[in-house]
Amino acid sequence: MCIRDRNTLDKYGPGGWTGYSYSWLANLKARAFDGNGAAKALRIFAECFCLRNGFHANGDQSRSGKSGFTYRPFTLEGNMAFASGVQEMLLQSHSGVIRVFPAIPSDWKDVSFDKLRAIGAFVVSASLENGDVSLVKVVSEKGGLLRLVNPFKGKFRIAGKKKKI
């Protein structure tokens, strides 16, 4: 997604949007490595378009002006897109390389995830402590070539059977 498209979404939205739109916006922002924008979209979705029980009701339940719609049909796709948006913030592998914490908001200093799946039959776990990546664990279920963008600022150690770099 190019910057022009991202700016267009921000400029023309959200009058005709529903809650689902914010979940998908979070995915788009995460894919563009905009963690702050992704978190903002998810926050709006949760605060304005979810009922107290966590169900997604397409219209703006808070009447905050985040949508021109206020109706209450229950749908699941907004919640599923929300979960996808969080995962895209934590881990991405769609471009042929694995990126750990590619779209983390600036105020998320301590974050971890366990056993998220990446393309290529890889299972990834990672930790961020005080804003620095402290652990990345990748398990290959089928073998094959691992391409990982180095998330570490300094020295690191690779442990495992094959260590070709």
Residue ranges and their predicted role:
Residues N7-Y22, R31, K66-L76:
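Solvent-exposed loop and edge beta-strand segments that line ligand/cofactor-binding
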Residues N36-K161:
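Non-catalytic C-terminal accessory modules of carbohydrate-active enzymes
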